[in-house]
Amino acid sequence: MHSSIVLAIVLFVAIASASKTRELCMKSLEHAKVGTSKEAKQDGIDLYKHMFEHYPAMKKYFKHRENYTPADVQKDPFFIKQGQNILLACHVLCATYDDRETFDAYVGELMARHERDHVKIPNDVWNHFWEHFIEFLGSKTTLDEPTKHAWQEIGKEFSHEISHHGRHSVRDHCMNSLEYIAIGDKEHQKQNGIDLYKHMFEHYPHMRKAFKGRENFTKEDVQKDAFFVKQGHKILLALRMLCSSYDDEPTFDYFVDALMDRHIKDDIHLPQEQWHEFWKLFAEYLNEKSHQHLTEAEKHAWSTIGEDFAHEADKHAKAEKDHHEGEHKEEHH
């Protein structure tokens, strides 16, 4: 009973806070209008003029307009429509903030729209957008600290949701591409795993040293060795698990750590650069298996997984190093 009361109070406070955030931000948007009036159109143009002047790094996302000045933005009809689009998005995000389900769904739709238009904007750029937007509003009206904080809160939740959406999208693209390297007991499925090692031994011969007793193998030797049937299945299964868990960040990170621990247990100590290099190898192999039919979105998705895998592997290596150094110091005390 007590826990139910506490939960109800927490929920009430959260809803009240979201409603207050919405109220403050909606009030400030009176100075960044949407509509067909001349004033509203100019508000949208002014947002992009401010962006192009103070955040020039964002210009590269506007093809053929990368070298625009604020004066160029003012004269280009493109920014009349685009300005209203971006202000409308800000209005909707603000208006739905106290309805989290709708807010999250709208963020997802915005991300999907950018994907359909082949506009790839890194998450950190989205984060910077909210700094820019708050500065822009501050140039149109006086923003008090509670209002600035309210917009920062919306920006933070927006960033959280795009991170969640982004991981879903990466997972979906990678899962689609795995049709080219199915795993199982059929001969062609076993061959998929063997082919990965054949590619490795042919094009990345320095990686052979991790395979004791097989350091001088050719790709023909790999084909004939039953070891690579089992090993090929293992590595393709691991890749599938990394892909399927990618939208669950804690599970993905834990699985990477488990893979690192397994290699250490088996006395396989790969240089960190080889973990990074593996993803280049895998991209080549997968593109070859797809007969060069991988989409750019699929290639980008695997690159993203590779970067996050390598980042987590680096963290694991540092933790291991710190642990061993700590043990070494204790031995000498």
Curated annotation (Swiss-Prot):
CDD domains named among the record's database cross-references: Mb-like
Keywords: Glycoprotein, Heme, Iron, Metal-binding, Oxygen transport, Repeat, Secreted, Signal, Transport
Entry's Gene Ontology cellular component terms: extracellular region
Subcellular location: Secreted, Extracellular space
InterPro entries in UniProt: Globin, Globin-like_OT, Globin-like_sf, Globin/Proto, Mb-like_M
Residue span, Globin domain: 25-167, 174-318
Binding site for heme b: Q82, H114, Q231, H263
A Pfam cross-reference name: Globin
Chain positions carrying an annotated carbohydrate: N216
Transmembrane segments: none
UniProt xrefs under PROSITE patterns: GLOBIN
Disordered as annotated region, ranges: 314-333
Signal peptide feature range: 1-18
One of the record's GO molecular function terms: heme binding
UniProt domain comment: Consist of two tandemly linked globin-like sequences which probably each bind a heme group and a C-terminal extension which may act as a cement between the eight subunits.
UniProt family annotation: Belongs to the globin family.
PANTHER family, per database record: BLR2807 PROTEIN (PTHR46458), GEO09476P1 (PTHR46458:SF1)
Subunit structure: Homooctamer.
Protein name: Extracellular globin
Organism: Pseudoterranova decipiens
Biological classification of the source: Eukaryota, Metazoa, Ecdysozoa, Nematoda, Chromadorea
